[in-house]
Amino acid sequence: MLSRKLFNGLLAIIAVASAIPGLVEARDIPVAKNVVLVHGLYADGSSWIDVIPYLQRAGLNVTAVQNPLTSLADDVAATRRALASQDGPTVLVGHSFAGTIISEAGNDPKVSALVYVAARAPDAGEDFGALAATFPKPAASAGVIKKDGFFWLGEEAFLRDFAGDIEPSRARALYAVQGRGADALPGTRTTNAAWRVKPTWYQVSTEDRTIDPELERFLAKRMKATTIELKSSHVSLVSHPKEIADLILLAAGHKSQ
């Protein structure tokens, strides 16, 4: 159970409208031993590299999935393999497109909580592209390059619209390791919405140029997620690793670092 001091501290950083219901639920979840981190499009598992040490110092076992990005089924299978190796309650975390992956895979009984980091959060069977089209089109979409059945983000769009608040040399390194996604991947519909049955947290990036911030707020509200907002680009896990780690620790029932 969260201490009164920690409870008050959490209230200070979480939007009041969404925080109170989420906090009530969060106090009843088991304390997690493990965290599984799932990356999204235009990235790989190394995008979590600055978040991981905070979690490890708190005593959590951390696994970062390397998604093939060849199909939703393949990505979900990679996440399920990671979950299968955990030995107890596990917080499942997804950034960006990985919100789709954790929504599909998150009904695993080991998953004690879900954390969405500037992420998609589709309902089961939902046409997420149609939902996203009801919000302003993000700038990064103009920089997508397609070739031979796969797509990635061009360098200019990556540096400006995906990782705009990252030191340029670091952003170029992230650009170099980005995964290539299969053309059909973003439009694949899920069959499950784990956020409907699992305690859920969400982080909104207010300066996001890859997913519209208002769409992120809509998703967080729809999920009744405990929500924080950061003045960040889409890659908040890189520009604000401590804040993201603290959110994950709260979902795991641990004190922030």
Label the model's feature ranges.
Residues 75, 180-242, 246:
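Conserved serine/cysteine hydrolase catalytic core
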Residues 1-10:
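Bacterial N-terminal signal peptides that target proteins for export
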Residues 9-19:
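Bacterial N-terminal signal peptides
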Residues 29-88, 138:
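Active-site catalytic motif of lipid deacylating hydrolases and related acyltransferases
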Residues 107-111, 115-155, 182-185:
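Flexible "cap/lid" loop of the alpha/beta hydrolase fold
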Residues 40-43, 96-97, 120:
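Active-site glycine-rich loops that stabilize anionic/oxyanionic intermediates
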Residues 93-98, 102:
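Gly/Ala-rich beta-loop-alpha elbow adjacent to hydrolase catalytic centers
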